[in-house]
């Protein structure tokens, strides 16, 4: 931890929340942090045991499942440096999970897509995650699950609006 780093640096242009919102925003911030922690803990024993995908690779493959993207597009969507995306995709290509192909729109850019092995691996990861979620949410009604999905979708869209990082390329 670097005590000289100010976590509020760069936030000067963002107005501070109204005092009446602070408690609610703190509750949302805590809930979001705990959701990430709990989801990771629910699925990490299976991932470690099976040598499965880490969270960044899982996110990258999930995004590429929708449609092929270039390194620059992946970096923009994931909010990480292109050199990091390049290293990550190189390992996944070497493992036979992704393949590069020429961009049909021309130019020198190459796109990435899942191979059949990559699709099977991603489907397996998704099954692990769905089993863990199914266990955690056992007893929730279909209506409650639909409402949770709707609110989380809305929350994600608000985060995208605030960050400028879009899941879509």
Where are these regions (language model features)?
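N-terminal leader segment of winged-helix/HTH proteins
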Residues: 1-55
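Charged, amphipathic alpha-helical coiled-coil/dimerization segments
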Residues: 6-8, 90-146, 150
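Helix-centric, low-specificity signal for extended rod-like, repetitive segments
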Residues: 19, 30, 80-81, 93, ...
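Alpha-helical initiation/capping and key positions within long helical/coiled-coil segments
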Residues: 20, 24-27, 77, 84, ...
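Amphipathic alpha-helical dimerization/coiled-coil segments
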Residues: 27, 31, 42-45, 127-164
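Generic structural concept
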Residues: 29-36, 57, 61, 65-68, ...
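N-terminal helix-turn-helix DNA-binding core of bacterial DNA-binding proteins
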Residues: 40-85, 89, 94-95, 111, ...
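A general structural signal for short secondary-structure boundary/capping elements
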Residues: 82, 105-110, 156-162
């Amino acid at each position: 931890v670097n005590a000289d780093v100010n976590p509020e640096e760069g936030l000067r242009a963002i107005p501070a929340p109204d005092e009446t919102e602070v408690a609610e925003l703190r509750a949302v911030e805590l809930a979001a942090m705990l959701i990430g922690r709990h989801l990771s803990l629910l699925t990490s024993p299976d991932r470690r045991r099976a040598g499965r995908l880490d969270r960044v690779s899982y996110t990258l493959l999930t995004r590429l499942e929708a449609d092929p993207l270039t390194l620059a597009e992946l970096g923009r969507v994931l909010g990480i440096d292109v050199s990091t995306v390049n290293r990550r995709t190189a390992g996944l290509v070497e493992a036979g999970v992704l393949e590069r192909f020429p961009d049909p729109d021309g130019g020198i850019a190459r796109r990435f897509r899942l191979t059949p092995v990559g699709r099977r691996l991603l489907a397996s990861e998704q099954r692990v995650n769905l089993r863990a979620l199914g266990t955690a949410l056992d007893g929730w009604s279909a209506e409650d699950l639909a409402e949770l999905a709707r609110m989380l979708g809305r929350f994600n869209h608000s985060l995208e609006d605030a960050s400028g990082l879009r899941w879509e390329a």
